[in-house]
Amino acid sequence: MLGSWQKNWLEQQLKATQNQRWNLIGQQVMVAPLLQPDLREVVDPNGNSVFVKSHSREAYQKAIDASKYNLPLLLDAWDGYPEAREDFLQLLKRHHNNNIVLTGDIHTGICADLYLEDDEQPVALELITPAVTSPGLDDYFPTNPQQQAGKAFIQQNPHIHYIEGTLKGWLEVNLTQQQMRAQWNYVSTVKQPNYQVSQGYSITRQANEAV
C-alpha cells in the first residue's frame, strides 16, 4: 500500500505538522477491518443485487455462502495488507494525537475507529463518504426487511460505529481548535434535479480526546 519512498515522505510530513491541532489524512480505500458476518442469515438470495447484474446469480450465492468464514470483504483495500496497515497506524500514533482519516471507494457511509492490533485505545477515526450515484453495501447484499446487511456488519465489527449502504449524498467535516464534527448528509433521489436533503449520522470528537 505504501512503498518505501511514500512511507518516508509520509513520516516527514507527519513530523512537520506535529504542532497542528488536527491531522487529516486523505486516501483512497478503507483502512478499518471489514470482516464479513454470516450473510446467509440476513441476505435475501433472490434479492435484486447489483452483484447479480455484474456477475451471475450463481456467483452471488457462492459469495453469500463464503461469508460464513468471516473473511475480510475488501482484500484490495488495507484489509489485504495488514502489515502495511500496522505500519501506517504506527506512524500516526508516533507523531499525532488527533488523527482523522478521510476515505472513499466503498460507496458507503461509514464511521470507524482505527486500532493497532494490540492496543485498546484507537489511533485514529476513519470517516468514509457515501456514494454520489454508485451502489453501496446494501445494494450488493439486499435483505428482507431492507438494510439489515449494514447492521450485521456492525455486529461483526465492533470498531465500526455506523454504516449506511443505500442512500446517496456527501460527508461534511467541520474542525475548530476545540473539536471535530462529521455529518453525513443524504439526498432523496439522484434521478431528478429536484431533491430533499436529510441529515444522517453525526459524530463529534474533542481535541486530544482518545479517538
Describe each model-derived feature in a short phrase.
Residues M1-V211:
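Metal-dependent phosphoester/phosphodiester hydrolase catalytic core
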